[in-house]
Amino acid sequence: TWEAKIGERPDAEVMAERKEHYSASVPDRVAYLTAGIDSQLDRYEMRVWGWGPGEESWLIDRQIIMGRHDDEQTLLRVDEAINKTYTRRNGAEMSVSRICWDTGGIDPTIVYERSKKHGLFRVIPIKGAS
C-alpha cells in the first residue's frame, strides 16, 4: 500500500498533466466491471469499477441512493443502478459483471431477496466491515 510521508504533497501541475480525458464512460482498456453496494439505514452507496490488464482500475460511477433501506421505491432505484449499462467509445454497452452487496447494518433478508432477484452469481451478499 502507498503511504504519504508527512509534509509530502503531489505537485498540482504534475497531477493536472496526468489527468486523462475519455469520450465515453468506460475507458478502452476496461475488460469488465464490478461494483460494491454499501447499505446504510438512510441510503445505499454504489461504486462501479472498471478493470483492465495488470489489475489497472478506474472508478466508472458512484451513486448515492437516498431513502429508507427497506422502502420499495428506494430498492427499485437500487435495482436500476444494478441494471445500468455503461458505454464504451465504440458505442458498445457494458453491464456490471459482479456486485458485492453489504448486508451489515440493515435487515440482511432485504439484500438476500434482492440478490436472488438479480442472480446470486451476479449480486453476492457480503458482510462489510464495521
Predicted regions mapped to residue ranges:
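Short, well-ordered loop/turn elements at secondary-structure boundaries
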Residues: 27-33, 39-44, 53-54, 89-97, ...
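Short His-Asn-centered micro-motif
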Residues: 37-39, 97-104, 126-127
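Short loop/turn segments at secondary-structure transitions that flank enzyme active sites
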Residues: 43, 52-54, 102-107, 129-130
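Metal-dependent catalytic core segments for phosphate chemistry
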Residues: 1-7, 39-81
